[in-house]
């Protein structure tokens, strides 16, 4: 009875939360009202979270059968477990902060459509988080893809924004084929799209590599893993609040969340586990290398997102999905804070994004600089900020796990590079000699400072809260020597100190124009230029070299001209009056007549 009441209250609160967000689409809603609706939805979402903390009981509900076939029933419902309830509140909290910040940032474009797009983006994520079946899951999944296209292309009169939005759609369509493959497999072999039923019905005798490879492909596209990552960098063409929401708590983390959701199946395939581990290791190292050589503040933060997503994928690859979710939750706060701080900085220095042209911002923007410092330290894993509670335990578990040395070394090197590019960002933008030309002094506005304060508090204390109340179900082994336990912290301090020393005491030469990390690993040049060139060149050659020649030479006017020329040449020879032609015609005629007479008479 207690379970039924708890389940009823939990699902009622989840439905109420989503329905309260739909008030944003009323015709008389302005931007302030939409932001208040988001705040109210966050407050309502805390109730099921408190119920879960008290009861420690998952809740799964299904409603009336939507599709009824001979052997296939589909029940729509909600999956209210630790993952759903925790990230539900996190996503609402961060979106509320981003929307309030947008009241200041987008004040020159007072358009409620932007806020409604953000609300729809969040509703798609919440629908995805709470889905207990594949139909709801793919509706939320595709909803995020559509809304990301609209938001990235918000400045639709800019060619770069159009191109970035198309990249996001195309790369995600590649990943979406994997999810469709899994849906087809589950319908054929388990006769169900309910995720819990699929987990129960699948057994070790099934060949799971193809459907699980589809899940990995879907996560690779959505979470911008190696090979399908270029769209995330291009997505910086959208407004900075969109980047903050996209990178922190919605679209890009949905791929990692998909792997966490399907871990009960993934753990049965060692091959898929190894693929996930190596994919995450390549992603985190590659993105960290690229971030270390970028000069655009938004691109540095974007590559840092890709690197952290790779770290989450590595964590799933060492069979610790709870730790991956812990890092996903803490990462949401300081990544949203980093983007909002960068938006404030860019707006102040007249839309300049090159960190080499900044400097001494702590004198001009002391509060924003403090928030940037805290978020960067949390990203590095500084004790005792939010990032420390997730990154430290991940690195400890990675050191104690039986993984191949290449994946371990790549992840450790990426962690060191995180300290390098974060320290470089702090120094060049805040502590070096000022190189700023134009300043736009900020007025004191609660819509600017309140979101930064809330996200800063989250970046400081949320890691402690979630690690206290939501301990992993699968506890890693912590019986390691003290020296090994403090190794990540020592490495963080050492690498940051070395970066400080070299940047202050050595003059670095300009990077080569075709330097691998600064060119994003040549991916834009190869995939967007070279492949497109040859892909378009092939049909051009087919049309010009094959079809045109076939028509022109064999069937077309040139062929007709050749045939007429041959015929006229023959008749011309016959009409020249030579005795040889007449004798030949005479002989042929006589022989034909004799042959005909012999055959018929």
UniProtKB/Swiss-Prot annotation:
Q: Does the keyword Ligase apply?
A: no
EC number of the protein: 7.1.1.2
Database matches in Pfam families: NADH5_C, Proton_antipo_M, Proton_antipo_N
Task: Give me the segments passing through the membrane.
Answer: 5-25, 37-54, 83-105, 112-129, 134-156, 169-189, 209-231, 240-260, 271-291, 300-320, 323-343, 363-383, 400-420, 451-471, 478-498, 508-528, 581-601
Q: State the annotated membrane topology for this chain.
A: Multi-pass membrane protein
Q: Which InterPro entries match?
A: NADH_DH_su5_C, ND/Mrp_TM, NU5C-like, Proton_antipo_N
Query: What are the subcellular locations of this protein?
Result: Mitochondrion inner membrane
Top enzyme category: translocase
In which broad location class does this protein mainly occur, judging by the first location in its UniProt entry? mitochondrion
Return one GO MF term: NADH dehydrogenase (ubiquinone) activity
Catalytic activity annotation: a ubiquinone + NADH + 5 H(+)(in) = a ubiquinol + NAD(+) + 4 H(+)(out)
Instruction: Describe the task this protein carries out.
Output: Core subunit of the mitochondrial membrane respiratory chain NADH dehydrogenase (Complex I) that is believed to belong to the minimal assembly required for catalysis. Complex I functions in the transfer of electrons from NADH to the respiratory chain. The immediate electron acceptor for the enzyme is believed to be ubiquinone.
PANTHER family referenced in this protein's UniProt entry, alphabetically = NADH-UBIQUINONE OXIDOREDUCTASE CHAIN 5
Q: What family is reported?
A: Belongs to the complex I subunit 5 family.
Q: What is this protein called?
A: NADH-ubiquinone oxidoreductase chain 5
Native species of this protein? Myxine glutinosa (Atlantic hagfish)
């Amino acid at each position: 009875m207690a379970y039924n009441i708890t389940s009823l209250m939990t699902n009622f609160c989840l439905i109420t939360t989503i329905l309260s967000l739909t008030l944003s689409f009323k015709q008389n809603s302005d931007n302030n009202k939409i932001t208040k609706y988001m705040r109210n939805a966050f407050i309502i979402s805390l109730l099921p979270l408190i119920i879960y903390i008290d009861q420690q009981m998952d809740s799964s509900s299904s409603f009336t059968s939507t599709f009824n076939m001979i052997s296939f029933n589909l029940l729509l419902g909600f999956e209210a477990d630790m993952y759903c309830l925790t990230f539900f509140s996190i996503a609402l909290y961060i979106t509320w902060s981003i929307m309030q910040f947008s009241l200041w940032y987008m004040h020159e474009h007072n358009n409620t459509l932007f806020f409604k797009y953000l609300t729809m983006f969040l509703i798609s994520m919440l629908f995805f988080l709470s889905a207990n079946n594949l139909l709801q899951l793919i509706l939320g999944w595709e909803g995020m893809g559509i809304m990301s296209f609209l938001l990235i292309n918000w400045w639709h009169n800019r060619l770069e924004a159009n191109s970035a939005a198309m990249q996001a759609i195309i790369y995600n369509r590649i990943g979406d084929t994997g999810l469709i493959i899994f849906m087809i497999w589950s319908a054929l072999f388990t006769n169900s799209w309910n995720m819990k039923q699929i987990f129960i019905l699948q057994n070790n005798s099934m060949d799971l590599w193809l459907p699980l490879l589809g899940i990995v492909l879907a996560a690779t596209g959505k979470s911008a893993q190696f090979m399908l990552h270029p769209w995330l960098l291009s997505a910086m063409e959208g407004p900075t609040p969109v980047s903050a929401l996209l990178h922190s708590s919605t679209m890009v983390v949905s791929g990692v969340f998909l792997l966490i959701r399907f871990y009960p199946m993934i753990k049965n395939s060692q091959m898929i586990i190894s693929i996930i581990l190596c994919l995450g290791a390549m992603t985190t190292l590659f993105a960290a290398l690229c971030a270390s050589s970028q000069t655009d503040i938004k691109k540095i933060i974007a590559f840092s997102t890709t690197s952290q997503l790779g770290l989450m994928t590595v964590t799933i690859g060492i069979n610790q999905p709870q730790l991956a979710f812990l890092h996903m939750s803490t990462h949401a706060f300081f990544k949203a804070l980093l983007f909002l701080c960068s938006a404030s900085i860019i707006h102040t220095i007249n839309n300049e994004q090159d960190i080499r042209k900044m400097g001494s911002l702590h004198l001009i923007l002391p509060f924003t600089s403090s928030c940037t410092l805290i978020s960067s330290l949390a990203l590095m894993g500084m004790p005792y900020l939010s990032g420390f509670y997730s990154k430290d335990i991940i690195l400890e578990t990675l050191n104690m796990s039986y993984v191949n040395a290449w994946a371990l070394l790549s992840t450790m090197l990426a962690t060191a590079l995180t300290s390098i590019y974060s320290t470089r960002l702090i120094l060049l933008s805040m502590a070096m000699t000022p190189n700023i030309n134009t300043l736009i002094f900020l007025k004191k506005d609660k819509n600017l400072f309140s979101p930064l304060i809330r996200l800063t508090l989250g970046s400081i204390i949320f890691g402690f809260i979630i690690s206290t109340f939501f301990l992993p179900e699968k506890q890693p082994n912590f019986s390691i020597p003290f020296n090994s336990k403090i190794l990540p912290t020592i490495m963080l301090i050492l690498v940051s100190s070395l970066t400080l020393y070299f940047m202050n005491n050595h003059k670095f030469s300009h990077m080569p124009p075709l330097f691998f990390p600064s060119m994003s690993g040549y991916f834009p040049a190869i995939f967007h230029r070279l492949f497109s060139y040859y892909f378009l060149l092939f049909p051009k050659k087919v049309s010009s070299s094959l079809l045109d020649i076939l028509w022109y030479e064999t069937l077309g006017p040139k062929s007709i001209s050749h045939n007429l020329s041959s015929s006229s040449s023959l008749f011309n020879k016959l009409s020249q009056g030579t005795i040889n032609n007449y004798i030949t015609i005479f002989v042929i005629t006589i022989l034909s007549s004799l042959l005909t007479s012999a055959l018929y008479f």
